[in-house]
Amino acid sequence: MLATLARVAALRRTCLFSGRGGGRGLWTGRPQSDMNNIKPLEGVKILDLTRVLAGPFATMNLGDLGAEVIKVERPGAGDDTRTWGPPFVGTESTYYLSVNRNKKSIAVNIKDPKGVKIIKELAAVCDVFVENYVPGKLSAMGLGYEDIDEIAPHIIYCSITGYGQTGPISQRAGYDAVASAVSGLMHITGPENGDPVRPGVAMTDLATGLYAYGAIMAGLIQKYKTGKGLFIDCNLLSSQVACLSHIAANYLIGQKEAKRWGTAHGSIVPYQAFKTKDGYIVVGAGNNQQFATVCKILDLPELIDNSKYKTNHLRVHNRKELIKILSERFEEELTSKWLYLFEGSGVPYGPINNMKNVFAEPQVLHNGLVMEMEHPTVGKISVPGPAVRYSKFKMSEARPPPLLGQHTTHILKEVLRYDDRAIGELLSAGVVDQHETH
């Protein structure tokens, strides 16, 4: 079987990188005349064994660029996030729906040797293999990098873990909040004199997903240059520590321990949220000119030439006194009044929006950040759309997140060329499962 799978993989690799087919382009079988109308990853197949957030976020972004994402799930259970609610829409959680568009779901029991065989056969005809199991878990099933590399040396194998492949805590399960704590993010998040706070969205997971997405794109370019695949080690801890940015540099270079600042900034004053008569506004003055403009808008011109506030260094040193003056002034007017006064000033500013206001924000709507699609069982749904737009292809059309096992039979037939009898036997044995839509 291994020899057969290797031959299939070699044939696919040759077709992908030779551009053979008379006027056909890289990655796709479309005529050259259509090349400006396709997404860059059309023709690329992603075998996705991830669940929860970091991995699915990475593969969703790849799917947005045209890749065919085959999502492998456990029969009868599926991705953990399918049950993470409320809220639910029909039987689907909105959490799951938020990060799984543009995918096909195949339900396979990978604890069964026949299920392992299916995964290996899929790997042989895919370009990318993504998983987020604890290190060694898939190797014990015969699906580790060495196992897949033997039959598909072209494969980009991306492993997403909590803490890395090796090391003293590499065998721990990794969840966003825990990695956020270990990495220091939670230590620097929260009110100045209060307890550490978990960020309102799972930024460690999302940052890891973006790192994995970028690494996979780099892997595809590397494969284009060399014809060979590679292994990618991506983890929550490394991703978040790398994102500590200047906070980490303050400690590593300046030996300055970090602290919590609430909405304020440790090195820039003023740069924080201010309470208004009816809400909050965030204002930032990153230089002396912007600070002078803030003072004029607040009708506090006497602060501009005050020797205690003439430079950012002095403003940081005299933070408490200055913020008290500014805060008292901001509380005298409605948020809408301040938004009107700051408009066109050149000073960065904005309201603190709840979700209702976010998705009523004209710029959010203009940027196309609400994506609508037709779900097979619940009808029209809306999810956050892609953050990036491209001039040569559109991101507006998307397939809805799949039902559990919705595409099992389709993938076995169309991708692996199984016949009806073989598929029926696998279904009867519980190796695979097919969701029937009505």
Curated annotation (Swiss-Prot):
Residues 1-31 form a transit peptide. This is Succinyl-CoA:glutarate CoA-transferase. Highly expressed in kidney. Intermediate expression in liver, skeletal muscle and pancreas. Little to no expression detected in other tissues examined. One of its GO terms (molecular function) is succinate-hydroxymethylglutarate CoA-transferase activity. It is an enzyme of class 2 (transferase). It is found in: Mitochondrion. Its EC number is 2.8.3.-, 2.8.3.13.
